[in-house]
Curated annotation (Swiss-Prot):
The keyword DNA-binding does not apply. Pfam families: Inhibitor_I29 (PF08246), Peptidase_C1 (PF00112). This is Probable cysteine protease RD19B. Disulfide bonds join 153-203, 187-237, 293-347. Residues 25-131 form a propeptide. Keywords: Disulfide bond, Glycoprotein, Hydrolase, Protease, Signal, Thiol protease, Vacuole, Zymogen. Glycans are attached at residue 250.
C-alpha cells in the first residue's frame, strides 16, 4: 500500500489530505497534525467523529448521521480539489463540512439583487492614488468590531452593512459601537430598483446598498446590545428610534479599480463588499488566489485592509491581498478573517464595493 502524504501546517490544528490506493480504488483519509513529531493518520469515519465533537454536531437519527457522513466525505474530496486549484491557501475541514453546497448557500450566504444603484446612492468620486501605502489595516486603527456570527441565517448582507457603518461612525465620532444586524433582518424590506421583487428579506438574503438606503430613510441603526441578534427572521420590527446611535449621511459605489478601492478604504473606512464564496466553505487560512473562480456574487463581507506579502503559487511571486472580515465566527478561517489576492478581481471581490459616510451627531 502506497501512502502519498501532503502535509499543511498552521499554528493551530489543521487538516491534511492523504490519498491511499487500495486495489486500484482511491480512498481519502485525513491526517490531523496534533503533534509534529507524532502525527496520527485517521480514517475518514474516525475523523468525522472528531469533526462532530469539535464543532458540536448532533444529528437527530442514525439515518441523518450516515447522510451527513456521506456529505462530509464528498466535501473532503471537494477540499482536495480546492487545494489543487488554490495552492497558496490552506483548505480542509471546517464547520461547514457536513453541508451540501445548496445548504451552505442557503444558510450562510445571502447576497441577492442586481447592480443598479438605489436612488440615494452615487458613484464614488475619483481619489488620488499616487501615495498609497503598501499595507493598511483598519483593525490596527480601532475601526473594526470583533468578528460576529450570522449562524444558519442568510443575513451576511446585514453584517456587511453594519460593519461598514461601524467603521464610518468611528471615523466620524471616534467611538466604535457594535450595531444591530437584527434591526436590518426584522425591519429592512428595501427593494433593489433593478430587479422587481428582489427585496431585503432577513435570513433569505438582501443587498448592502438596499440596506444603506433603508438606514438612510429610517434614520440609522441601534446598538447591537439594544437590539440583539437572534439569527432568525419573521419577527416584528422592534425599532426604537430614540435608541438610534449611528446614522448614514450618504453612501456610494466604488469603481472596479483596485487603486480606487484602496484609496476609498483608507479615506472612508471599511468597505461593504460582495464576493463569490465558493472557496470559502473549505478555507482554513493563507492567501486565497484560485486559478479559476466565478464572479457571480453571493456573499456579503467587509473589506478592512490589504497586505503585500502573500505568496501566489499561480504567479510564483509575492502577491498583494485584500483582508476580509467575515461573519461566520472566529473559529472559521484566520480568526474569522479571509485573505484573497488583489490584482484580477478574483471571485468578483472588486465588482460591488460600497462606501458609507456617517453623521457626526
Amino acid at each position: 500500500m502506497d501512502y502519498h502524504l501532503r502535509v499543511l501546517f498552521s499554528v493551530s490544528l489543521i487538516f491534511v489530505f492523504v490519498s491511499v490506493s487500495v486495489c486500484g480504488d482511491e480512498d481519502v483519509l485525513i491526517r490531523q497534525v496534533v503533534d509534529e513529531t507524532e502525527p496520527k493518520v485517521l480514517s475518514s469515519e474516525d475523523h468525522f467523529t472528531l469533526f462532530k465533537k469539535k464543532f458540536g454536531k448532533v444529528y437527530g437519527s442514525i439515518e441523518e448521521h450516515y447522510y451527513r457522513f456521506s456529505v462530509f466525505k464528498a466535501n473532503l474530496l471537494r477540499a482536495m480539489r480546492h487545494q489543487k486549484m488554490d495552492p497558496s491557501a490552506r483548505h480542509g475541514v471546517t464547520q461547514f463540512s457536513d453541508l451540501t453546497r445548496s445548504e451552505f448557500r442557503r444558510k450562510h450566504l445571502g447576497v441577492k439583487g442586481g447592480f443598479k444603484l438605489p436612488k440615494d446612492a452615487n458613484q464614488a468620486p475619483i481619489l488620488p492614488t499616487q501615495n498609497l501605502p503598501e499595507e493598511f489595516d483598519w483593525r490596527d486603527r480601532g475601526a473594526v468590531t470583533p468578528v460576529k456570527n450570522q449562524g444558519s441565517c442568510g443575513s451576511c448582507w446585514s453584517f456587511s452593512t453594519t460593519g461598514a457603518l461601524e467603521g464610518a461612525h468611528f471615523l466620524a465620532t471616534g467611538k466604535l459601537v457594535s450595531l444591530s444586524e437584527q434591526q436590518l433582518v426584522d425591519c429592512d424590506h428595501e427593494c433593489d430598483p433593478e430587479e422587481e421583487g428582489s427585496c431585503d428579506s432577513g435570513c433569505n438574503g438582501g443587498l448592502m446598498n438596499s440596506a444603506f438606503e433603508y438606514t438612510l430613510k429610517t434614520g440609522g441603526l441601534m446598538r447591537e446590545k439594544d437590539y440583539p441578534y437572534t439569527g432568525t427572521d419573521g419577527g416584528s420590527c422592534k425599532l426604537d428610534r430614540s435608541k438610534i446611535v449611528a446614522s448614514v449621511s450618504n453612501f456610494s459605489v466604488v469603481s472596479i479599480n483596485e487603486d480606487q478601492i484602496a484609496a476609498n478604504l483608507i479615506k472612508n473606512g471599511p468597505l461593504a463588499v460582495a464576493i463569490n464564496a465558493a472557496y470559502m466553505q473549505t478555507y482554513i487560512g493563507g492567501v486565497s488566489c484560485p486559478y479559476i473562480c466565478s464572479r457571480r456574487l453571493n456573499h456579503g463581507v467587509l473589506l478592512v485592509g490589504y497586505g503585500s506579502a502573500g505568496f501566489s503559487q499561480a504567479r510564483l511571486k509575492e502577491k498583494p491581498y485584500w483582508i476580509i472580515k467575515n461573519s461566520w465566527g472566529e473559529s472559521w478561517g484566520e480568526n474569522g478573517f479571509y485573505k484573497i489576492c488583489k490584482g484580477r478581481n478574483i471571485c468578483g471581490v472588486d465588482s460591488l464595493v460600497s462606501t458609507v459616510a456617517a453623521t457626526t451627531s
